[in-house]
Amino acid sequence: MISFKKMHGNGNDFIVIENLTKEHSLSKSQLIKKKKKKKGLGFDQLITINPPKDSNHDFYVKFFNSDGSEADMCMNGVRSVGAYLWEGALAPKKPLLLGTKSKPVLIRPMNSKKVKVVLDYPVQKEIPKSEAKFLERCGLKKYKFINAGNQHLIIETKKVFSYDLDNLSSRVRRRKFFKNVNISLFTKLPKKLELRTNEAGAGETLSCGSASAATASFNIIDKSSIKIISAGGELSLRKINDKLEMIGPAEFIC
């Protein structure tokens, strides 16, 4: 019997499993079965909390998408992991360093069911000319390719709901270069950004933390902050030198 908690971070839907004794292992087919909303548990990502691989880290966290693939990072997910550990008394209520497939992230407990994540500043990447021409044929002109733990194609538009995002994402991911890339649309509003994301392996979600980080990274200056609004709620992001701080909710469903 696997013990778990159903949680969400800004509407991003998770199953969180404590696996500190390494007793649990789920196959890809089992993950897909648990994903099914009517017969399974339903989730955007399934998260396992494991013993640290590095002596400097407190825990090692794995993220599995609803199609059974493993994600490199999930910012909304690490906040939920923090809440799980602190509320379950599995760790003292203090900052924790979590190892991930991508890179370690620092989490800090906040008030009002919120958690702060401190991460390395997202990095903009170059897109090969052939892929840039392909995006142009898709009608895309204003975009950035960003590594924020996961790879993100961030597209600026006047209205985030003006595109068929599922169709666009499917078309773009047929290219080998973009196969595992998260695809987002954003628009600039007064003092905030509106964001919509289709995650590789999970589809469109109510919120994506790493997409929010990627989008904020080229829209703020040092020691300033910005709010990211998605269908699931609001995240607050701030640039501090070479780090990006994210504050958002982490709540238990059942």
Predicted region positions:
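Short, charged beta-turn/beta-strand-edge "cap" motif at the junction between a beta-strand
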Residues: P104, Y121-P122
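Short, basic/low-complexity N-terminal boundary segments at the transition from targeting/disordered tails
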Residues: P122-P128, Y163-L168
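C-terminal domain-closing interface element
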Residues: Q124-L140, K144-G149, L244-C254
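A glycine-rich beta-to-alpha transition motif near the start of alpha/beta enzyme domains, typified by
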Residues: M1-N111, I146, L153-C254
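Short, solvent-exposed secondary-structure boundary/capping segments
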Residues: K113-D120
